[in-house]
UniProtKB/Swiss-Prot annotation:
InterPro entries reported for this sequence: NGRN/Rrg9
Protein name: Required for respiratory growth protein 9, mitochondrial
Native species: Neurospora crassa (strain ATCC 24698 / 74-OR23-1A / CBS 708.71 / DSM 1257 / FGSC 987)
Keywords per UniProt: Mitochondrion, Transit peptide
Biased composition (Basic residues): 103-115
Gene name as annotated: rrg9
Top-rank lineage group of the source organism: Eukaryota
Length: 329
């Protein structure tokens, strides 16, 4: 080997294992192997070594050799741990010691004392009190003993069938009461708002949907009455409803009503319906529909920029709009 420190460590290990003393004269110094040094220097890269490290290595080797001669006859010991010594003194019993505990244990002691005192008091009370016997149920007793007990009380023993019938009737009454009571704070049946009740009522009243009443002019109302009065067999309610595009119920109400407006109310109605008709035929004129002579005299003219080609393309839409506005008259 090239270093004395390595040979010293190996020698100590072999001596401890085989209990054989190795003389120090067999130590081979690095100076005795010049060829080996040349080989190492050529193969390995060059490393600088400080003066302090070389001196420390030599001192370690000399100390190891001196220790061999002194400890040859002694018993082998375990190899020392190569740790750096600290300033604190070594304590061999540090594993057995435990950290100091807190001396103040008053809360735990108080809890334990209270628990022990309560258990002792309950045990004393249990010793003084007599154990309560379980009350025997009459239902478990035989029939003869039950008859005797009822006789002592001055009552007649009820029949088993009657008792079962009475019990079943009570259960049915409870079930009815639970069904009749309103369910409060039940997520499955939450409380309904007033508008929800109104919506359900409208659905029941108008299952096909809401159909608003058609507004008929005063002249149309008078014409319905006159036609039905002059030709009752020909102009029935069904024929009039198809002619004026209203429900038969509306025709019946018109024929049944006996209300007639006053002269002042009649004037107001005529003025209101005249304004309404004027607005409707203005919309028709914008679509290119030629209004009647009555409304043309009022200054309503069809749209001048309406082209003939567009009139053909929008013919179906015009017919639909005319039907819609006629329903409003």
């Amino acid at each position: 080997m090239s270093c004395s420190c390595n040979t010293a460590a190996l020698r100590i290990f072999v001596r401890n294992v085989a209990n054989i003393q190795v003389p120090s004269s067999q130590q081979v110094t690095p100076r005795a192997l010049p060829g080996f040094r040349r080989q190492m220097t050529t193969s390995l890269p060059f490393h600088t070594r400080s003066l302090h490290t070389t001196r420390a290595a030599r001192s370690d080797s000399t100390e190891a050799v001196s220790e061999e001669t002194s400890t040859a006859t002694e018993k082998p010991k375990a190899p020392k741990l190569l740790f750096r010594k600290t300033h604190a003194p070594a304590n061999p019993n540090w594993m057995g010691e435990q950290p100091p505990r807190r001396q103040d244990h008053k809360p735990r002691e108080l809890k334990k004392a209270r628990r022990d005192h309560g258990a002792h008091a309950s045990q004393e009370e249990g010793d003084h009190t007599e154990p309560t016997k379980k009350k025997n149920r009459w239902r478990d007793l035989p029939e003869e003993e039950r008859r005797e007990l009822y006789a002592k009380m001055g009552k007649e023993m009820p029949d088993e069938a009657e008792r079962q019938a009475r019990k079943q009737e009570q259960q049915q009454q409870k079930l009815r009461a639970s069904l009749e009571e309103p369910k409060k704070h039940n997520p499955a049946h939450p409380r309904r708002e007033s508008w929800q009740h109104q919506k359900n009522a409208l659905k029941e009243k108008f299952p096909e949907g809401w159909k608003p009443l058609k507004k008929l002019s005063p002249d149309a109302l008078e014409g319905i009455r006159a036609l039905h009065k002059q030709f009752p067999e020909e102009y029935t309610t069904e024929v009039l409803s198809n002619k004026f595009q209203v429900s038969p119920e509306a025709i019946r109400r018109i024929l049944k009503s006996k209300w007639r407006p006053d002269p002042e109310e009649e004037i107001e109605r005529q003025e209101r319906w005249f304004k309404r008709g004027k607005q409707i035929w203005q919309r028709y004129a914008e679509l290119g529909v030629k209004p009647p002579k009555k409304w043309r005299e009022q200054g309503i003219r069809p749209n001048k920029y309406w082209k003939e080609g567009e009139e053909k393309t929008f013919k179906d839409r015009q017919i639909a709009n005319v039907k819609l506005h006629r329903s409003l008259l």
